[in-house]
Amino acid sequence: MKNQAFNSILLDISTHLSQTKNSVEEGIQWVCETLKNNLTAYQWVGFYFAEPITKTLHLKAYAGAPTDHTVIPFGKGICGQVALSNAPFVVPDVTLQDNYIACSVDVRSEIVVPLFLEEKNIGQIDIDSHQPDPFDEEDTQFLEAICKLIADTYGNALLEI
């Protein structure tokens, strides 16, 4: 059932991105809103992009409650760890995670998947859930497909946001 929903949403995102001439910012904002509005476990969805010189991640689009964490140093929190590891990171229970930056007291779990452009980690998608342990390998594969679609759609323009 989850996979069927993911396939439908991925098709909607692919169609929207290919048929509209949105800016990168508008496109990734639309993706954030689409995921948050269509997947009950995705209470907060955001895209962070890397600034290699300062070794920081910068929040460029999100859907959900506002956050104070708009700039995250590499290595700090789940997002910062993914900036260094280049690998997806699923946290079933954030209360058990040592290197965790709390965005909201309501967050129970998190998944972060890197966004690659020409095999370089340029950013990531970050999902927070108020449910414990809702993310699995299907979520990881789905979010990897979304990141690839965004990289394929916008290419080097992603480096300019």
Language-model region placement:
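Intrinsically disordered, low-complexity terminal regulatory regions
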Residues: 1-62, 66, 156-161
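Juxtadomain coupling helices with adjacent low-complexity linkers
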Residues: 10, 14, 129-161
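Short hydrophobic/aromatic beta-strand element in the GNAT-like acyltransferase core
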Residues: 44, 112, 124
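Regulatory sensory and allosteric helical modules in signal-transduction proteins
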Residues: 49-56, 60-102
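A short, aliphatic-rich beta-strand micro-motif
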Residues: 109-116
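Sensory-domain boundary capping and coupling elements
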Residues: 116-129
